[in-house]
Amino acid sequence: MFGDRQRPMVLVLGLGESGLAIARWCARHGCRLRVADTCETPPNLAALTAAGVDFEFVGGAFSPALVDGGIELVALSPGLSPLAEDLAPLVAAARERGIPVWGELEFFAQALAALGANGYAPKVIAITGTNGKTTTTSLAGLLCERAGKKVAVAGNISPAMLDKLTEAIDAAALPDVWVLELSSFQLDTAHTFAPDAATILNITQDHLDWHGGFAAYAAAKGRVFGPRTVRVLNRDDAEVMRFAPPAAAADAPRAVTFGLNEPAADGDYGLLRENGIAWLVEAIDRDGADAPAAPSRRRKQEAANPPDIALKRLMPADALRIRGLHNAANALAAYALARAIGLPAAPLLHGLREYRGEPHRVEVIATLDGVDYVDDSKGTNVGATVAALDGLAQRAVLIAGGDGKGQDFEPLAAPVARWCRAVMLIGRDAPALREALADTGVPLADHATLEAAVRAASALAQPGDAVLLSPACASLDMFRNYAHRADVFRSAVEDIALEKGTTL
């Protein structure tokens, strides 16, 4: 369970959901535990004590001295950056002594390897990316279930991977398929994780303070791929395509791509627009086609020896219940992952039609007087808001702002200029947003509260428009979390609905 170590003494840093899961897992397998948290009484301390775990707790600032006294393994919670001023010296001290630093994902990978020695061989699907992870993870899990598999969905989406694994072991019900949502934080401290199929949905600026820069952030995303992992790549994203294996390499892992254009290579996925209908399609070698397919528009001169490609229609994009072109891309990614582990197409396509989406992710919560009110509070970075605007593809009054996390807001300018009737600015980094959008020609208005922004947006919106809460920022400057921000938005929309003589 712990590599070449038998019941090591483990230092667990941070007692959030993941840290608690690691501590319980290690205790379950006979490890001695030292648990440290910068909070003197972290909320999960009582839960760990109640679990009957024997451990030493150290509260307060982290110190390199925490690795003294026989520590053999350091477990790092995903919320803690190893570059942080209070943590970097401790991590350096551990590495100087040859003490491994693992996150929960590495513990999970080691656990699967140990279970594999006894014959357990599940398929593992992993999803990462700046945006769209939760939607794609939930959808991939549903697709695998519809194909008749026993499925466990865990990771960044919650519950913690080790908690889900413990539950499955105790119930003697280990799943056939693991579907994992993974953040860059979780991947950064993984070393042997090697899923059967994995995707990077997109890579745009986010969490630069945690990683120390964009290159390190992108590199962490790339750790989702093992040596033989089938790589499901977004061909519309140049940063993602940097992880495409060299075509000439004889031992290169298999890769398939998805995108919002027509696919041009056998096994790739995309969109075909024909007679006013957008179709989800798969590119197939015409010699292997088993169903009527549309000819590809790819010109023969684009490759020296191009295959004879046809496009197999899977389903109309409008048959998806999740809105926006970005969600069509997420659906293609989920479908590609399920196909990559050998699942049959028919039940997967039924699952695509069934999935209704996740809360706070481009969720239409009301339509009042012809105006859609859209909750995208989970849009906590610039890339998410760009995707929401381009995906909805309708005139919008945008509500944006909050804690910008050091992002560059310039990429918002083009979609705002194209789609927005006006932008309502809120939160700490409203001035930075105003500066980035100043040359768009779109009216900008500052508001002290989200409620005021919603009311002003409603007054400006015309029938056919959307009032879109997609902040491009974190929420903690004004709210407890993004869900609280969404609740405030919904409450403000409910007030407007009541004034119009209706309810949500």
Swiss-Prot record:
Coiled coil: none annotated. It is found in: Cytoplasm. One of its GO terms (biological process) is peptidoglycan biosynthetic process. Pfam families: Mur_ligase_C (PF02875), Mur_ligase_M (PF08245), MurD-like_N (PF21799). Cell wall formation. Catalyzes the addition of glutamate to the nucleotide precursor UDP-N-acetylmuramoyl-L-alanine (UMA). Belongs to the MurCDEF family. NCBIfam families: murD (TIGR01087). This is UDP-N-acetylmuramoylalanine--D-glutamate ligase. It comes from Burkholderia mallei (strain ATCC 23344).
